Amino acid sequence: MSTTPPRNKFPLPLDAVVERKPAPARTAGLPAVGTPRPAAPTPAPAKPAKPRLPRTAAPAPAPVPASAVEQRASAATAGGGGMASARARAALAARLRAAGIRDERVLSAIATVPRHLFVEPGLASQAYEDAALPIGHQQTISKPSVVARMIELLREGLAADAPLERVLEIGTGCGYQAAVLSQVAREVFSIERIRPLHEQAKANLRPLRVPNLRLHYGDGMLGLPQAAPFSAIILAAAGMEVPEALLEQLAIGGRLIAPVAVMPPAGVPGQTVTQQLLLIERRNRHRFHRTALEAVFFVPLKSGTI
């Protein structure tokens, strides 16, 4: 811990702040006359110490204000033309509203986070289309409508102005969904198993300086037990089932949203494996309620790190 250098006490004696002049030379036959010095001021009586208040726990972090992210996005994309414009983000949010997204907090987050910062420069012109785009390493950035829909499902039942509490994201990718989550949650933890993507997400998010978001490199199928329990968990990759470790890390009353594989009926030729969203609500320590939702398409959920 750094320390502050000692400060001079005030008021200072006059001779400490006025430049001293040399005494005049003695004149023959006359005694030297000394210049009178003012008396040092009487120090003020010490003030009685104020009683110390008991320490209270630090408040939980809050979602980053949209205005702060917008200002940082503007600074990061100065001179970027139309893609840096808030109008492009607002138009995307308006299209999602027309498509059925109703959570205004989610729509505000979509209208705030600059998606073009999270895609390759050559794809910037497509950043505000409702389309999944490649980000390298055989991974994609999800469609904005899917991001909004999944987060809306996590927030279902909350008051309009109430944030999610502690959220875990499995599959950081380029960092876009994590940035959107940071606008609607107090704390966001995101895990990525592919090292170059983890580093890319850090670089993408750095200009936005999001204080309530923590990125981790590791196996997402194991979750993040040191930070559990989580009030919400969101998976950005599809597995045959939701890993048991993630269910264990979901808080009672919490929600998990994930794409999962759906096997075709046995004995039916020509059918392929499909995917659908699965919403899991934890009712108590041992009981989970599952709701199958619409069809989706995600990259596969894999274990380990690379």
UniProtKB/Swiss-Prot annotation:
Its function, per the record, reads:
Catalyzes the methyl esterification of L-isoaspartyl residues in peptides and proteins that result from spontaneous decomposition of normal L-aspartyl and L-asparaginyl residues. It plays a role in the repair and/or degradation of damaged proteins.
**Per the record, which residues fall in region Disordered?**
1-82
Instruction: Write out the GO biological process terms.
Output: methylation; protein modification process; protein repair
Gene3D superfamilies, alphabetized: Vaccinia Virus protein VP39
Q: Which family does it belong to?
A: Belongs to the methyltransferase superfamily. L-isoaspartyl/D-aspartyl protein methyltransferase family.
Active-site residues are 142
Q: Which NCBIfam families does the record associate with it?
A: pimt, PRK00312.1
Q: What is the lineage of its organism?
A: Bacteria, Pseudomonadati, Pseudomonadota, Betaproteobacteria, Burkholderiales
GO cellular component assignments: cytoplasm
Q: What is the protein name for this chain?
A: Protein-L-isoaspartate O-methyltransferase 2
Entry keywords, A to Z: Cytoplasm, Methyltransferase, S-adenosyl-L-methionine, Transferase
List its EC numbers: 2.1.1.77
Gene that this polypeptide is encoded by: pcm2
Instruction: Tell me the InterPro entries matching this sequence.
Output: PCMT, SAM-dependent_MTases_sf
Under Gene Ontology molecular function, one entry of this record is:
protein-L-isoaspartate (D-aspartate) O-methyltransferase activity
Q: What is its main location?
A: cytoplasm
**Organism annotation:** Cupriavidus necator (strain ATCC 17699 / DSM 428 / KCTC 22496 / NCIMB 10442 / H16 / Stanier 337)
Reactions this protein catalyses: [protein]-L-isoaspartate + S-adenosyl-L-methionine = [protein]-L-isoaspartate alpha-methyl ester + S-adenosyl-L-homocysteine
Name where it's found.
Answer: Cytoplasm
Give residue spans, biased composition: Low complexity.
54-77
Into which EC class is this enzyme placed? transferase
Compositional bias annotation for Pro residues: 38-48
